[in-house]
Amino acid sequence: MQVIKLQILFTPELVHRFFIFFLIISTTSCGVFKKSKKISPRDGVVYYAKTYLGTPYVFGGNTKAGIDCSGLIHNAYRMQGYRVPRTVDELRKKGKRISVDRAKKGDIIFFRTSKKRKLTHAGIVVENKNGIPKFIHASTSKGVIISSIGNSYWER
């Protein structure tokens, strides 16, 4: 009978490799790495629009260097895979009219900011509590901000 003697050498490199292997196995099996949570298209539109907060107003602009209200809407929807028109006038033709108190996150709301009957401004609803929406928009004086419909300026 012949006896074979095996000698295993635990070199520092081998120990290090085993440690890394067991670390990877233990962290993945313990749920340390969580799957990313999917967000709704409405949440995605609002999330992306909020990345423009503080961006200055520039008529016809559509970048972080300067943006107008329809540029903000166009970019936020485009990042979610939607093709929407670039002007307020064209945007208003695409949707259906609902009452302001029914507006949901991600909906587009329109305003007349002059005495003319034409709609000249728009924003994206970020929330609607008790029928009073808050919306993100590009203000000519303050840049991209969040405002409330309850503000007297928007009630006129």
Where are these regions (language model features)?
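Sec-dependent bacterial lipoprotein signal peptides
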Residues: 1-28
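Aromatic- and glycine-rich peptidoglycan recognition patches
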Residues: 31-37, 41, 82, 96-98, ...
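Extracytoplasmic/secreted envelope proteins and their assembly/folding machinery
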Residues: 42-46, 50, 70-74, 103, ...
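Short, Lys/Arg- and Gly-enriched loop/turn segments at beta-strand edges
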Residues: 116-122
